[in-house]
Design a protein with these regions (language model features):
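Hydrophobic residues on short alpha-helical segments
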Residues: 25-31
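Short, hydrophobic-biased segments on the C-terminal half of alpha helices
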Residues: 56-57
Length: 133
């Protein structure tokens, strides 16, 4: 029987993209809870914003995260919000921060969350042993 030559499944490509750098997995985990601006992520991880932007762009290119967009009644006053015009209903179209795409959510649920859970369990066991000493 001839070997079937085929492409890797797309999910493996996307998982590989995330795990090329541990910070990408951390970014994905962090934004799985809520939309965040790159500066907020950089501050939380104590990493320069340009490094965070580099990883965000790679994750965007891979289709795992996207820029969060919404419509607002009033002109936004906070920093880091981009105004993209007005909708037909007269609301401001704004974009800010990043959020997971459907594929990104799948990656977090299938691969990243279980890894963090195992890591947290190991940490709890370690702490418990220290307390018993």
């Amino acid at each position: 029987m001839a070997k079937k030559e085929g492409k890797k499944k797309p999910i493996f490509d996307k998982v590989g993209l995330v795990f090329r750098s541990p910070i990408r997995a951390d970014i994905m985990k962090e934004i799985s809870h809520n939309v965040q601006k790159p500066q907020e992520i950089a501050d939380k991880f104590e990493i320069p914003k340009q490094n965070i932007n580099y990883h965000i762009q790679a994750l965007k290119k891979g289709g795992l995260i996207k820029t969060h967009t919404e419509e607002r009644e009033e002109m936004p006053s906070e920093r880091g919000v981009r105004i993209n015009g007005k909708s037909e209903s007269g609301k401001f179209k704004v974009s800010y921060g990043v959020e997971l795409t459907k594929n990104g959510k799948n990656i977090v649920n299938q691969f990243i969350d279980p890894l963090y859970e195992k890591e947290n369990e190991k940490e709890k066991i370690k702490n418990k042993k220290k307390e018993e000493e």
